């Protein structure tokens, strides 16, 4: 899911693919927020998926799960619009909490010990293998 109405896409994924399971793994590859007017609902739904199906749902952090893009592209504004008001500390803390969660999200996953999945990719001019990246951890 990238761009567009992700909230509706969750429904379609469940309808077409079924719920996450041992034989039906889900990998969401970043840019969960800043892509429509329901970013909060999308990321919270994704967190619920991860809690309910911890071994079957994986989430990579994309470049939109960063402070700079959250400010520039509207995620912070969405939080203020939906949760701001008389007590503006609420929206400030909510934005900070999401930022903290985003910083803990992994930037990559390895599938079957040989396929590296990252949101933005790796430069084509490099000759890296998954083992090379693993050795640098």
Which stretches of residues belong to each language-model region?
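Feature recognizes metal-dependent phosphohydrolase scaffolds
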Residues: 1-137
């Amino acid at each position: 899911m990238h761009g567009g109405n992700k909230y509706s896409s969750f429904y379609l994924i469940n309808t077409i693919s079924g719920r996450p399971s041992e034989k039906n793994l889900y990998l969401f590859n970043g840019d969960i927020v800043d892509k429509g007017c329901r970013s909060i609902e999308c990321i919270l739904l994704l967190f619920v998926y991860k809690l309910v199906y911890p071994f079957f749902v994986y989430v990579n952090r994309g470049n939109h799960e960063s402070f700079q893009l959250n400010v520039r592209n509207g995620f912070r504004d969405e939080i203020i619009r939906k949760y701001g008001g008389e007590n503006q500390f609420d929206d400030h803390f909510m934005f900070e909490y999401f930022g903290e969660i985003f910083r803990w999200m992994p930037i990559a996953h390895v599938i079957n010990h040989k396929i590296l999945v990252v949101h933005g990719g790796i430069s084509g001019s490099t000759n890296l293998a998954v083992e090379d990246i693993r050795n640098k951890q």
